[in-house]
Curated annotation (Swiss-Prot):
One of several proteins that assist in the late maturation steps of the functional core of the 30S ribosomal subunit. Associates with free 30S ribosomal subunits (but not with 30S subunits that are part of 70S ribosomes or polysomes). Required for efficient processing of 16S rRNA. May interact with the 5'-terminal helix region of 16S rRNA. Its main location: cytoplasm. It comes from Shewanella baltica (strain OS155 / ATCC BAA-1091). One of its GO terms (biological process) is maturation of SSU-rRNA. This is Ribosome-binding factor A. InterPro entries: KH_dom-like_a/b (IPR015946), RbfA (IPR000238), RbfA_dom_sf (IPR023799), Ribosome-bd_factorA_CS (IPR020053). Monomer. Binds 30S ribosomal subunits, but not 50S ribosomal subunits or 70S ribosomes. Signal peptide: none annotated. The lineage of its organism: Bacteria, Pseudomonadati, Pseudomonadota, Gammaproteobacteria, Alteromonadales. Belongs to the RbfA family. Pfam families: RBFA.
Length: 157
């Protein structure tokens, strides 16, 4: 019996978190006019079991840590307003307090992917460069050997 209640609570908080993520993404994209925030992606939302708090994991496509911190501070200062906008869209008795947290995993993943792509491209360039040089060296060596073989066979006749 206790297990079923716990499972239902978890699924409800997860459903609320998913809906909150969707609503936050729409509000931040359409309704927020603050130029300090710019383009923001809501990666995940983690709602507490009592629905009093929600950790909102966001990403800005910026590499400069100072700019990221400014954007995060702008979101944090706008959190009560954002909460009000989202509360109007969701039918909850208690609207969780929003706590914005910068999530660098997406940016780090993109950075790692770019590094891997660069290494692959450099490796291909080296293979083409050395591969064509090796082929020309092989042609020269084989060409000389073939010519030597031809000379030897002509001399035997």
């Amino acid at each position: 019996m206790v297990r079923n209640i716990m499972a239902k609570e978890f699924s409800r908080t997860r459903r609320i978190a998913q809906q909150l993520q969707q609503e936050l993404a729409q509000v931040l994209q359409r309704d927020m006019k603050d130029p300090r925030i710019g383009f923001v992606t809501v990666n995940d939302v983690d709602v507490s079991r009592d629905l009093s708090y929600a950790k909102v994991f966001v990403t800005f496509f910026e590499e400069d840590k100072a700019v990221v911190q400014e954007k995060l501070n702008a979101l944090i200062s706008a959190a009560p307003y954002i909460r009000t906008l989202v509360a109007g869209r969701m039918k909850l008795r208690v609207m969780p307090e929003l706590r914005f947290i910068y999530d660098s995993s997406l940016v780090e993943g993109m950075r790692m992917s770019n590094l891997v792509s660069q290494v692959i491209n450099q490796d291909k360039a080296k293979q083409q460069q050395f591969g064509s040089e090796d082929a020309s060296v092989e042609d020269e060596v084989l060409g000389d050997d073939v010519a030597d073989d031809a000379d030897e066979t002509e001399g035997k006749d």
